[in-house]
């Protein structure tokens, strides 16, 4: 009482249980076809009218297969997943490590900010100082991370730094070139319609 939540009352005597249980059910196929939808991602409209981009299993698996090999996601700890699943760049951090046998570190909704990511990266000593397989960020997030992460903590924090979602300037990667020279830096481009990335 007093709340604005609607209630639904079901009287068990009114349900037709015998008739419902006698219905023949058709089992749906649990194996998707290549052209079946894997997900729909809504674009920002930067390449045209805002719309939902329909991503097929074929396109998704093609990208993930390529990414697991190119980013060598089986080397290291896996990847922190710090972005929203509504952002297609998260697909790389989430699925690529899992499909190559490494792990993902899911950040809580309270811990999605750059401060929490900084803390996780700075605390890698508890993982035996092993490197993350990959870290995917926008260049703006990289600039924020670079400003807060100590230079000595940049070294070995990840094997591959993947940047995308906006224009990348050389000044953004300069601290990483200087303090983490063994970290591979990749500028990935791709409109949502092409399944995350189509050019590096």
Question: Model segments located where?
Answer:
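Motif- and composition-driven signal specific to adenylation
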Residues: 12, 17-200
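Structural core segment of the AMP-binding/adenylate-forming
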Residues: 1-16
